[in-house]
């Protein structure tokens, strides 16, 4: 199923019971978070709060609160089918030359589809049906959530931030939280290595003293939202990738006040600039780690204009101790990562980011081990392969006889195949998420790799244990007599 815009997606979810409307008044201050947290932990539906206290604009929350809804948003019917999305990304990341005429012919539809997915520019876009300018620009008119008791201010959580560097042909989409400072100002919390921050830095070097144009999209079609959190190859824009997922070109319209382009069917768009040198102290906020993060300075985004559809919908979420929506997204996108990793390291059998690991801080990988030291090669390969894994603190490597999605199996491998000194790899002074207060220095800390594979000659001088396995014929005989046993 493909979706033209957010409302189309919501309509389809509602028909299948995957979206429920809440008609009673609910406060954006804390109440909304508590309701969403309970619903998400129960693997419940997306919620449309029709009467946020003090506001006329409804709030859509818990949209991607189950892996199934993430898959549906990507145009697939099941989480397992996301492997096909990963295979497509792996091919686009490193396309292989055709092995012959037939292979070239087979690959032609994919290449043609990619070329045909350049975004389509439109005018008279729905997202500009209503325009607030001047004194009308007031963020308090939007039902922005105040998620946790210790949060310093309301927080924009699902904003797709659109930027463009001076030397790039394509725009960048990123999701960065934004603390509300006043009627027309928010703090743009982007980390230094993220696309938006890189675009801003390059713009400042090329245009000293000039304001940097930014647009923030609040609520758009699911393919575009998910494209912004997927490891899209640098040769492909997130808008193009969204078109591939959707099976139709992403329709864009130009912002009123800048050359940036935003989804034409977006619900709400914030247009404005970041002035060089204008910074503010951000936080504290409850984060996906389950703790309040420490404060840090980030650029201030000044909003000149707010455009929206008629009867707009505000898309929101919260972050907290797993499971939360980012953790659920991590579980689903895990299936996209597997083919990408297997393309680079064919010996990888499976890869898993347990949601308890705060989306990316711990990874477990199973391999077809082929030589001594193989596990260590995989550890360093994963840490350096995708930007998403730069902050992974712990990697556990096991053999292909272990189901890495079953903690009982993983712990058995760790306790029977590991020696603490020999099989632990520690790496110091590596990039760490600055939100990780456990690291000795903000943004810099250590990583740990655990080799829980069977050891080969060269890794041990001892005779290695053989796992106990029941005779296959006996298992079959017991299977056939099981009903008769009356157990």
UniProtKB/Swiss-Prot annotation:
<dbReference type="InterPro" id="IPR049381">
    <property type="entry name" value="UbiD-like_C"/>
</dbReference>
<comment type="similarity">
    <text>Belongs to the UbiD family.</text>
</comment>
<dbReference type="InterPro" id="IPR049383">
    <property type="entry name" value="UbiD-like_N"/>
</dbReference>
<dbReference type="GO" id="GO:0005886">
    <property type="term" value="C:plasma membrane"/>
</dbReference>
<dbReference type="Pfam" id="PF20696">
    <property type="entry name" value="UbiD_C"/>
</dbReference>
<keyword id="KW-0456">Lyase</keyword>
<keyword id="KW-0285">Flavoprotein</keyword>
<dbReference type="InterPro" id="IPR048304">
    <property type="entry name" value="UbiD_Rift_dom"/>
</dbReference>
<keyword id="KW-0831">Ubiquinone biosynthesis</keyword>
<keyword id="KW-0210">Decarboxylase</keyword>
<comment type="function">
    <text>Catalyzes the decarboxylation of 3-octaprenyl-4-hydroxy benzoate to 2-octaprenylphenol, an intermediate step in ubiquinone biosynthesis.</text>
</comment>
<protein>
    <recommendedName>
        <fullName>3-octaprenyl-4-hydroxybenzoate carboxy-lyase</fullName>
        <ecNumber>4.1.1.98</ecNumber>
    </recommendedName>
</protein>
<keyword id="KW-1003">Cell membrane</keyword>
<keyword id="KW-0479">Metal-binding</keyword>
<dbReference type="GO" id="GO:0005829">
    <property type="term" value="C:cytosol"/>
</dbReference>
<dbReference type="GO" id="GO:0008694">
    <property type="term" value="F:3-octaprenyl-4-hydroxybenzoate carboxy-lyase activity"/>
</dbReference>
<feature type="binding site">
    <location>
        <position position="172"/>
    </location>
    <ligand>
        <name>Mn(2+)</name>
    </ligand>
</feature>
<dbReference type="GO" id="GO:0006744">
    <property type="term" value="P:ubiquinone biosynthetic process"/>
</dbReference>
<feature type="binding site">
    <location>
        <begin position="194"/>
        <end position="195"/>
    </location>
    <ligand>
        <name>prenylated FMN</name>
    </ligand>
</feature>
<dbReference type="InterPro" id="IPR023677">
    <property type="entry name" value="UbiD_bacteria"/>
</dbReference>
<feature type="active site" description="Proton donor">
    <location>
        <position position="287"/>
    </location>
</feature>
<dbReference type="GO" id="GO:0046872">
    <property type="term" value="F:metal ion binding"/>
</dbReference>
<feature type="binding site">
    <location>
        <position position="238"/>
    </location>
    <ligand>
        <name>Mn(2+)</name>
    </ligand>
</feature>
<comment type="subunit">
    <text>Homohexamer.</text>
</comment>
<feature type="binding site">
    <location>
        <begin position="175"/>
        <end position="177"/>
    </location>
    <ligand>
        <name>prenylated FMN</name>
    </ligand>
</feature>
<keyword id="KW-0464">Manganese</keyword>
<keyword id="KW-0288">FMN</keyword>
<comment type="pathway">
    <text>Cofactor biosynthesis; ubiquinone biosynthesis.</text>
</comment>
<dbReference type="InterPro" id="IPR002830">
    <property type="entry name" value="UbiD"/>
</dbReference>
<keyword id="KW-0472">Membrane</keyword>
<dbReference type="Pfam" id="PF20695">
    <property type="entry name" value="UbiD_N"/>
</dbReference>
<dbReference type="Pfam" id="PF01977">
    <property type="entry name" value="UbiD"/>
</dbReference>
<feature type="binding site">
    <location>
        <begin position="189"/>
        <end position="191"/>
    </location>
    <ligand>
        <name>prenylated FMN</name>
    </ligand>
</feature>
């Amino acid at each position: 199923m493909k979706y033209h815009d957010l409302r189309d997606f919501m309509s389809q979810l509602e028909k299948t019971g995957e979206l429920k409307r809440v008609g009673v008044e609910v406060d954006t201050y804390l109440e909304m978070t508590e309701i969403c947290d309970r619903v998400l932990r129960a693997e419940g539906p997306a919620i449309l709060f029709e009467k946020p206290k003090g506001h006329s604009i409804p709030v859509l929350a818990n949209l991607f609160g189950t892996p199934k809804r993430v898959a549906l948003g990507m145009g697939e019917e099941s989480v397992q089918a996301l492997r096909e999305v990963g295979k497509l990304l792996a091919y686009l990341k490193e396309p292989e030359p055709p092995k012959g005429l037939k292979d070239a012919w087979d690959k032609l539809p994919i290449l043609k589809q990619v070329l045909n997915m350049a975004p389509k520019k439109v005018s008279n876009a729905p997202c500009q049906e209503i325009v607030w300018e001047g004194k009308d620009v007031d963020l308090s008119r939007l039902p922005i959530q105040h998620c946790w008791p210790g949060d310093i201010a309301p927080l924009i959580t699902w904003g797709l931030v659109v930027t463009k560097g001076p030397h790039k042909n394509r725009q960048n989409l990123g999701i960065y939280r934004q603390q509300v400072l006043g009627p027309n100002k928010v703090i743009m919390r982007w980390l230094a290595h993220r696309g938006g921050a890189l675009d801003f830095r390059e713009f400042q070097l090329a245009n000293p003293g000039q304001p940097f144009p930014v647009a923030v999209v609040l609520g758009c079609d699911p393919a575009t939202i998910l494209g912004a959190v997927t490891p899209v190859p640098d040769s492909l824009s997130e808008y193009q990738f969204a078109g591939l997922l959707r099976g139709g070109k992403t329709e864009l319209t130009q912002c009123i006040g800048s050359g940036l382009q935003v989804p034409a069917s977006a619900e709400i768009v914030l247009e404005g600039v970041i002035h060089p040198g204008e910074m503010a102290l951000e936080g504290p906020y409850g984060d996906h780690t389950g703790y309040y993060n420490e404060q840090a300075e980030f650029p201030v985004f000044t909003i000149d204009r707010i455009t929206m559809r008629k009867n707009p919908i505000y898309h929101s979420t919260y972050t907290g101790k797993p499971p939360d929506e980012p953790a659920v997204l991590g579980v689903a996108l895990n299936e996209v990562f597997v083919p990408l990793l297997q393309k680079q390291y064919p010996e990888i059998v499976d890869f898993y980011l347990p949601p308890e690991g705060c989306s990316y801080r711990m990874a477990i990988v199973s391999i077809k081990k082929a030589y001594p030291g193989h596990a260590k090669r995989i550890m360093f390969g994963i840490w350096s392969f995708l930007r998403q894994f730069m902050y992974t603190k712990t990697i556990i490597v096991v053999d292909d006889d272990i189901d890495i999605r079953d903690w009982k199996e993983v712990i058995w491998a760790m306790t029977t195949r590991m020696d603490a000194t020999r099989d632990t790899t520690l790496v110091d002074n590596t990039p760490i998420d600055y939100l990780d207060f456990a690291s000795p220095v903000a943004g810099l800390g250590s990583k740990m790799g655990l080799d829980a594979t069977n050891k080969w000659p060269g890794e041990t001088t001892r005779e290695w244990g053989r796992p106990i396995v029941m005779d296959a014929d006996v298992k079959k005989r017991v299977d056939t007599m099981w009903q008769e046993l009356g157990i």
